[in-house]
């Protein structure tokens, strides 16, 4: 059986995902067969695993860090929040059903078996499995039936390292408080802790380390600074949208309206990484900037609900004005569906609204259907005759006159639509901006020249940098026990 360690946090967004990715790369660089695992993830940023089916994009990134094929078993339970129907539940890559919060709590005990079975599959043939928890084990109101943190750790017998985020303040109280409220059996699973996102002179925290050990008895396995490479990794969660830069003075301004159920917004990361692009995320209450040359409508977990919110924010009027000025629009997946004349949902898959008018910027209509398209795809852009690689995760079929001008040929089949004036483009293909040739041609069409970086190589280099920084700042004795 493989060795395993689980990183749990004192809260959400403490940096567990990046630490797991960095440790996976560090172990892989030392020649180990290492695999990531997350029992339960809640995110609308999904990927298509190499063995088919959906997993969180964070686990897809961690598999990339581990230099191992991704699998649905690396994230056996994925919760995708949507509208009034609660969350869609994905189990081992396939749609299991839908449930609201309290109903899901009742489902968790029966999902534990699937989680443990997937963990066994991931561990089979591996030297090391690095597990990521969700939220915090201190949420003791959710401990009964837990599958994400201590419920999994105790059942699988995996020791836990607790991660505290010092940047947000109160890290000593967070760690000591977690120790205080955990049950004895759960507390015994914790072997030590890591301080993450430290700024400044580490020696200034020496007294803090002594205080934490005095209250908890836990050793410190390292004080990790802000990792410079982390900013070059794909965005994982909508929480990070609050921190993404607005502005920067790039020659080309691209605006992205942030809708409540935004999905797969890491599609935008390759554009955000370009130094001559100013990518701005627009929140509710803000106007779409009049000087934006391109507006991108990203994916959505609930097209109809997000379309209503788009109108409530006044962004439909902003979009119409943008197009009248000659501005361009790209809609991806749910964003593509919004650009059409009508969205039909006769089975109520997204809720109670069975039909809603779209923005009518493309002469197409979408009908939602229960069959879900989930696959990795290869394509060629018809606009720029450039190769594309990406993935599809969507419900529904889109048809109409503008589909006669497909935006791409995907897996040998026409996909998407282009308006007659060429200003509006829609596609179901996620990940198109990560295709360097396509991104280069797109930016050239706005007058930007120059050589573009290889986006996938830049992510890979960032993972190596993070692994190097962890090797520098984590306790060498602890690391030796983990990765040899």
Swiss-Prot record:
UniProtKB keywords: Cobalamin biosynthesis, Glutamine amidotransferase
InterPro entries xrefs: Class_I_gatase-like, CobQ/CobB/MinD/ParA_Nub-bd_dom, CobQ_GATase1, CobQ_N, CobQ_synth, GATase_3, P-loop_NTPase
Active site: 333, 430
Pfam family name, one: GATase_3
Pathway info: Cofactor biosynthesis; adenosylcobalamin biosynthesis
One of the record's GO molecular function terms: ABC-type vitamin B12 transporter activity
Function of the protein: Catalyzes amidations at positions B, D, E, and G on adenosylcobyrinic A,C-diamide. NH(2) groups are provided by glutamine, and one molecule of ATP is hydrogenolyzed for each amidation.
NCBIfam families: cobQ, PRK00784.1
Protein name: Cobyric acid synthase
Annotated gene: cobQ
């Amino acid at each position: 059986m493989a060795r395993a360690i689980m990183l749990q946090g004192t809260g959400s967004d403490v940096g567990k995902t990046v630490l797991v990715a960095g440790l996976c790369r560090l172990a892989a660089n030392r020649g180990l067969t290492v695999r990531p695992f997350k029992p339960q993830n809640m995110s609308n940023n999904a990927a298509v695993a190499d063995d088919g089916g959906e997993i969180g994009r964070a686990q897809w990134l961690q598999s990339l860090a581990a230099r191992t094929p991704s699998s649905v078993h690396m994230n056996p339970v994925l919760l995708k929040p949507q509208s009034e129907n609660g969350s869609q539940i994905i189990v081992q890559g396939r749609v299991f059903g839908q449930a609201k919060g309290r109903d899901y709590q009742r489902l968790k005990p029966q999902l534990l078996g699937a989680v443990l079975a997937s963990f066994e599959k991931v561990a089979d043939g591996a030297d090391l499995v690095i597990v990521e928890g969700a939220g915090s084990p201190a949420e003791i109101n959710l401990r009964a039936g837990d599958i994400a943190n201590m419920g999994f750790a105790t059942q699988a017998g995996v020791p836990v390292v607790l991660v505290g985020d010092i940047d947000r303040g109160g890290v000593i109280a967070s760690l000591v408080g977690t120790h205080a409220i955990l049950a004895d059996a759960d507390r015994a699973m914790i072997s030590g802790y890591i301080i993450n996102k430290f700024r400044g002179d580490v020696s200034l925290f020496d007294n803090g380390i002594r205080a934490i050990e005095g209250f908890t008895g836990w050793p410190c396995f390292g004080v990790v600074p802000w990792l410079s490479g982390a900013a070059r990794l794909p965005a994982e969660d909508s929480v990070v949208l609050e921190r993404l830069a607005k502005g920067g003075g790039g020659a080309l301004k691209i605006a992205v309206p942030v809708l409540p159920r935004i999905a797969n917004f890491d599609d935008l990361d390759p554009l955000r990484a370009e130094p001559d692009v100013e990518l701005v995320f627009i929140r509710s209450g803000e106007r779409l900037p009049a000087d934006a040359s391109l507006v991108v409508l990203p994916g959505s977990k609930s097209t109809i609900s997000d379309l209503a919110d788009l109108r409530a924010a006044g962004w439909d009027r902003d979009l119409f004005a943008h197009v009248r000025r000659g501005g361009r629009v790209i809609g991806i997946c749910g964003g593509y569906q919004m650009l059409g004349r009508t969205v039909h949902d006769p089975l109520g898959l997204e809720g109670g609204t069975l039909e809603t008018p779209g923005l009518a910027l493309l002469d197409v209509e979408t009908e939602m259907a229960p069959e879900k398209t989930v696959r990795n795809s290869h394509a060629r852009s018809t606009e720029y005759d450039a190769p594309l690689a990406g993935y599809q995760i969507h419900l529904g079929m889109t048809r109409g006159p503008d589909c006669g001008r497909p935006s791409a040929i995907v897996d040998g089949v026409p996909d998407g639509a282009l308006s007659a004036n060429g200003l509006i483009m829609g596609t179901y293909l996620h990940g198109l901006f990560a295709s360097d040739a396509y991104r280069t041609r797109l930016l050239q069409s706005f007058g930007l020249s120059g050589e573009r970086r290889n986006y996938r190589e830049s992510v890979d280099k960032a993972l190596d940098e993070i692994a190097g920084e962890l090797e520098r700042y984590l306790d060498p004795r602890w690391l030796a026990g983990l990765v040899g």
